[in-house]
Amino acid sequence: MTHLQTLWPSVALAVLAGLGAGAAWAQEPPALRVGALLWDRTEVTVAQFARFVQATGRVTQAEREGGGFEYVGGWQRRPGWTWRQPDGQPVRDDVPAVHLNFAEAQAYCQWRGARLPTAAEWQSAAYVEQRSDPPAPFQRARLYPYPTGETPQGANTSDPDPWPRAAPAGATAAGVNGLFDMGANVWEWVQDAQGEERRTMGGSWWYGAHQMRADVVAYKPASFYAVYIGFRCVRPVP
């Protein structure tokens, strides 16, 4: 039994027993089929979230309260830091949308007819290769220690890499199942709750590669928002 199977054996066994996934692309945004779900291939971007705001008129909590948070010897509010300008300055519209709390992430997904994944769904997509004929070096049915494969190489962590902050969608190395940034770049909200908190997955650019592993458990207040937290959506295969 592998290290990851000891952490979530029911997920690993179910996936390994019934691999039948292939790639399926949606018009907007790009999606990949992993098992019974279509996954956003990347984290939701500023441009994608902007379409939701334009359609719904949503004003986020960070915008109402004067800006999001960054950790510098403690949580510091940064005036003007919102999903529009994650670091308070104009950015490319293909960087992850951050400074969004759990409800805002879920609302965006629901607007698209999708939802946030569960932690178990997220782990199976991030660590178990389910493509029928994956490109090298990935191997079908292999359980990996990192979403990038055998090593964290190619992810956007605090270790040396080309990206000092969040990387644009698709800029890092594609990982297990062809998904981008399931490890690092920004934390991702999932549905799992612990009281008033919700779980986040995968680590971020602020942390080292150890936060990318499956055994990391990180909960945050559902109302919290910061420069390190984004999300992606899933929906059933039609």
Q: Locations of the language-model features?
A:
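Functional-site microenvironments in short loops/helix caps that host divalent-cation chemistry
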Residues: 59, 66, 70-71, 77-218, ...
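Short, compositionally biased
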Residues: 2-85, 102-103, 130-132, 228-238
